[in-house]
Amino acid sequence: MTKHRNSHNNELSHHLYAVTDKKDNDIVKYGISSDPIDKDGLSGRLRRQLRLFNAVVGWARFIGKILVKGIKGRKKVELMENEYIKAYKKEHGRKPRANRK
């Protein structure tokens, strides 16, 4: 049986990404994915997030960047994502706008 990709037992290679608002140059969200990274440097998950964010505002306001590649295991990448969110909160006094957890 295949392990669910959100399971902490998932040992696939993951990456950590950031979505940035071009309007104020602020990071809106940190995210993680085990989707393959395509030739354009984006994964399917990051691309879907960008499409959604940009569709809501009606223009190409948000950009994405993969920050760290090749992180083995879902649990490890979640811990890394949380550290990035904590560092952002320490610097800005709040979490990125789209990071709810």
Question: Could you tell me what each predicted segment is?
Answer:
Residues 83-95:
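Short arginine-rich
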